[in-house]
């Protein structure tokens, strides 16, 4: 451990702050690096980003480690944001956080860490690594089940995991804040960031409309009867209730409407009434662009658990790997609001096997 150099991604939040502190306490040679991934385009966002940088700098000064900044805005635009726009244009709902981990934090940043002569990269993710009996590295759920972030990390392979440390993966979130407070880190009570990394807290619709032209269209019920108008299919996600703008439809009960399907060919959004409407449920899905943590699927056909969204409880299923590398997943119980563009991630107990993109 002595003299092993660890470069920590410091975001200005409490998780990465405590990660850096713990590594320093464990005797590593630690450097904190702030990654700038987005050129702010409004004043509020600029102020928020400036605050994050100031907090990151303050934390590093307080711990007594060097602080650096690196700009990945070009890489982010090319490898994350453009893909994000293509997916939305195609009517799917992508997960940019997964792509950001794959392309920026564990690729561009990892290359930068090598340039700095770092032995390891560290982040404030709630995840763990474990050495398996065969010598491979497993990606394991964080101890705090409510905060586990392996769903966003399933694209990581052996090479990346061997060079990665997750210092807070075996700690509860409440304890992380406690450690920050005890050590007088300015971020101890900073609220967790929400929203997509580059949009921050802004209104999603407003943001997307700056980059993609929206085409308005009709909203139909499951029988093809027009019940309203939509602002553009890209603004809606399967299972969504808020913002459909359907209210008081003649001769219909006062039951909430939910987005159930996108008819891209005719630019029609299909909506149904009731949270548990059968059209919102599916028992199977197909996924492409598979990533397996171990480098390959466990078998051509296997049983495991899966999540189709972050923080969903593990769902029992059977996975069949096709010759082209895609998978068919059949769940024991029908799943609500399976969303094309989102990821399905597979687990056996607390080990993340990998995942893919739902089509």
Curated annotation (Swiss-Prot):
Gene that encodes the chain: mnmA
Annotated GO biological process: tRNA wobble position uridine thiolation
Protein name (database record): tRNA-specific 2-thiouridylase MnmA
InterPro entries from the UniProt entry: MnmA-like, MnmA-like_C, MnmA-like_central, MnmA-like_central_sf, Rossmann-like_a/b/a_fold
Keyword check for Chaperone: no
Annotated stretches, region: Interaction with target base in tRNA: 95-97
Source organism: Francisella tularensis subsp. holarctica (strain LVS)
Function: Catalyzes the 2-thiolation of uridine at the wobble position (U34) of tRNA, leading to the formation of s(2)U34.
Cystine residue pairs: 100-197
Record key words, sorted: ATP-binding, Cytoplasm, Disulfide bond, Nucleotide-binding, RNA-binding, Transferase, tRNA processing, tRNA-binding
GO molecular function: ATP binding; tRNA binding; tRNA-uridine 2-sulfurtransferase activity
Catalytic reactions of this protein: S-sulfanyl-L-cysteinyl-[protein] + uridine(34) in tRNA + AH2 + ATP = 2-thiouridine(34) in tRNA + L-cysteinyl-[protein] + A + AMP + diphosphate + H(+)
Origin organism lineage: Bacteria, Pseudomonadati, Pseudomonadota, Gammaproteobacteria, Thiotrichales
Family of the protein in this entry: Belongs to the MnmA/TRMU family.
Gene3D superfamilies: Adenine nucleotide alpha hydrolases-like domains, HUPs, Translation factors
